Design a protein with these regions (language model features):
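Extreme N-terminal starter segment of soluble prokaryotic enzymes
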Residues: 1-5
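Conserved N-terminal Rossmann-fold NAD(P)-binding element of oxidoreductases
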Residues: 7-9
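Short glycine/serine/threonine-rich phosphate/pyrophosphate-binding segments
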Residues: 12-17, 80
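Short, charged/polar "capping" segments at the starts of alpha-helices
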Residues: 14, 38-43
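A short, Lys/Arg-enriched amphipathic alpha-helix followed by its capping loop at the start of a domain
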Residues: 17-28
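Short internal beta-strands
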Residues: 29-37
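Glycine-rich, highly charged phosphate/nucleotide-binding loops
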Residues: 46-65
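N-terminal glycine-rich phosphate/adenylate-binding segment common to multiple enzyme folds
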Residues: 61-80
Length: 80
């Protein structure tokens, strides 16, 4: 599937970003990437697709190749 936005999530701010995106365009196709199942649980209410798992450089490349997106928003922890 082609997504409008990939949100690299991991902070409270990532939830705020997703909320704003959906408020602006409820039909926005969003994929969120989180490191843990807990992160996934925190985003389930938004009805978006969620990738779970820690990603290194190659993991991100694979994610991008398998899930094309028009925009990427990095809302991960600033020290991660």
């Amino acid at each position: 599937m082609k997504y409008d936005v990939l949100v690299i999530a991991g902070t409270t701010e990532s939830r705020q970003v997703i909320e704003k995106l959906l408020r602006a365009n409820p039909k926005e196709r969003i994929l969120a990437s989180v490191a843990t199942e807990l992160g996934k649980e925190m985003l389930l209410e938004y009805g978006i697709d969620i990738h779970v798992g820690r990603l290194d450089y190659d993991g991100f490349l694979t994610l991008f190749e398998e899930n094309p997106c028009r925009k990427i928003i990095d809302a991960s922890h600033p020290f991660a």
